[in-house]
Amino acid sequence: MKMVKSIAAGLTAAAAIGAAAAGVTSIMAGGPVVYQMQPVVFGAPLPLDPASAPDVPTAAQLTSLLNSLADPNVSFANKGSLVEGGIGGTEARIADHKLKKAAEHGDLPLSFSVTNIQPAAAGSATADVSVSGPKLSSPVTQNVTFVNQGGWMLSRASAMELLQAAGN
């Protein structure tokens, strides 16, 4: 009788394990479980990338450029990369003459202050440039345009205006 109870208990346990296994396989037989994400918020705007900063030079960059242009120890023939379109031979000779004349008359060195730098047309910027020197009673301020052509340089029109102003 003891043996019959053991066999009955073993069969019951086997039946329970078999039933459990059959239930598990029937759940898995339906294929893999796929979860779907449900949207929670409708109509909410997505965050945008921050606006890119305008392409403008720093005051230090422009001041350095202007100091290089006003250096009487360097010929204008070597300053072509500082002016849009370069500096032609005749222009270089005229500018060198005027700069040497200014040095002889004690008008140099010049000091530049660059303020109010603003983006302009694509690849350009404007700035208020104040020039002071030994013989200027007060700084002279002019709005000047700079262009970015692989590096910041003085626009051709502004270079001609400055050259004409220096001749007066």
From Swiss-Prot:
Taxonomic superkingdom: Bacteria
Keyword terms: Secreted, Signal
Propeptide: 23-48
Major subcellular location class: secreted
GO cellular component: extracellular region; peptidoglycan-based cell wall
Cell compartments where the protein resides: Secreted
Keyword Secreted assigned: yes
Signal peptide positions on this chain: 1-22
Keyword Methyltransferase: no
Functional description taken from the UniProt entry: May play a role in the development of protective immune responses.
Family listed: Belongs to the MTB12 family.
Descriptive protein name: Low molecular weight antigen MTB12
Organism name: Mycobacterium tuberculosis (strain ATCC 25618 / H37Rv)
